């Protein structure tokens, strides 16, 4: 935002130099990137009148001019401009003048045998234009009593000004206006603010006119003023100078006024040619509609480009024809021109997110869209509109013929509680109640002490603690700060930045503070270490993803693009894509893991609509040794992949149990016959399995790729229940092992059999291991032969054969009772 100090001084008095003001604004949170002293551009350039212009005796394209500079004799100046002629008023750089635009210091010089005593300047030579056709001519009716010959031309060119180029944070939309910055300067200097006088508009409705707003959230307020009898022409110099200081070019008086209001109030306006609007509407009833674009619609904007409108383009429509990209740019077909006599002045509020999407859909970013995207002040819409109408009637003539309005603005009120004790906790003991009230009041906040609060600002030592605790204000937030002042800490920041961060004492901790990690963070770090230890690489993926048509994913309210319109509900899809990318790039199989958050719709009776959780995901597979010198193609099998996962969990202190899920609970990403859920202490913690062959074929992946996804919370809860791990000494007594074999149905899971064996064997059963599976000759159809090795051991004695056989018989009996198995041993 470019701030003209000359304009700023009309809104607030201050005695600071440009450098001092720039430093004060920077410390207050508005970084001043550049101070542009336009006064240096024409220091030494004066007003002159050409008395005579004769051809140069030694050069065909030069003229020798006699220029009256208000002194005793005219100055002789050699000039090459084609428009140099007697009688015109010009800008003359006298000897000794330095022109920064040319990096040139003017001196008397011999020009082909004629001594030239200065230079007649064009606007380009004064830094006001990129290029000029000839020397600049002042209006012939210029008041020479107010500006005599030989006087400084800088006031005539708007070069008696200093411009601050400053940036503000994205939450300070109010800082994109002269009034907004003037409020800050008034608060910094404790001087009163002088807002431009505005006469409230009173007008009858526009006859036979209809206004339709398709979505009140996208356009909560819309106002249109019909003004007739307007004479479009050049703007006065003061208006041109203000626009030039802001980096804008003058177009005509009506358009310049809308740009002036944008700079002054931060409220974008747009003026339509009313007769052209009626022509676009045809014979239909005059109607303005605000809606989203429909398929196939186009609009030729003011920059001359014909744009194909997207579904998220927000439009102003006349009848059925788009005439403007709402909040971004107007249309060429209805622009105000030299023949315009009736205008329709639009003043509206558009939703920031809707405007952002609309602008991005067309690759446009304008001064108007920048302000709408940050959020325009809801409270000053009428003031800005009425100020524009007032200036149009003053500078372009005409009369107001009608007004149309739509207004569904939300309530413009917010009250926050501010505690002096909290201010002191955050900022330090230097904070005094009187300073808080003075600074926040200067910023436009209304403060009132809560009932029962101490009304004394000064704190005596005897009552300091009680007074601080009881000093509480109710703070009414001004409408122009509703977008960024939402909490108590925001008020504390407002006080701190104007009080001055340099005024707070530097307080160091009196005692060393020992840092510590939470149990969750400690456990997460252990997981990372263990997974890296089994050869997996940690990866990170963005949690945003495209939305699914079935609505299974949680959608984002204001997505940046359709590709990022929802949040993920699992880590495995992202890991599959990472595996595919590495495989396609020739990097071989990816062995990786990720720890991240996933999001899902909550199920009843959860009162919250959404839930989020932290998951651990992993992917591994393919040939782990693709460059083996023996050229063996041996991809990782199920048991290797499962063994890596089990070893990682065992190193973390967990003994996982694998169970076969029913088909309706299985993951569609995994092979239906080669996936299992993981359980710990009766809680389901995740799943493991081989990727579905169809998925591998679609992605071009090797056949044997495995994935797992675990929930972090059940693992952490298991650790918390376990408490401190107690050391259990190893038994010094020998073990006794027994084998058991039997025929079992093919659909009977080994995990279920193992559970029954462990339960029947009791505490003396140390381990159970499947060591053989056989299908073929000698095995009944539909069955398989399974053989388990059971190891028994007691911590305090050597088990006798009788004890072991008794336990083994219990196992046989339980297997025969629980399952349709045929014992073989």
UniProtKB/Swiss-Prot annotation:
Primary subcellular site in the record, as a coarse category? cytoplasm
* Annotated positions binding Mg(2+): 484, 490, 493-494
Give the PROSITE patterns listed for this entry: B5, FDX_ACB, TRBD
The Enzyme Commission number assigned here is 6.1.1.20
User: Which co-factor is required?
Assistant: Mg(2+)
Set out the biological process GO terms recorded for this chain's protein.
Answer: phenylalanyl-tRNA aminoacylation
Q: Which UniProt keywords apply?
A: Aminoacyl-tRNA synthetase, ATP-binding, Cytoplasm, Ligase, Magnesium, Metal-binding, Nucleotide-binding, Protein biosynthesis, RNA-binding, tRNA-binding
Where it sits in the cell: the answer is:
Cytoplasm
- In this chain the tRNA-binding domain maps to 39-154
Read off the HAMAP family from this record.
Phe_tRNA_synth_beta1
Family label? Belongs to the phenylalanyl-tRNA synthetase beta subunit family. Type 1 subfamily.
Q: What is this protein called?
A: Phenylalanine--tRNA ligase beta subunit
What species does this protein belong to? Synechococcus sp. (strain JA-2-3B'a(2-13))
The beginning of the lineage is: Bacteria, Bacillati, Cyanobacteriota, Cyanophyceae, Synechococcales
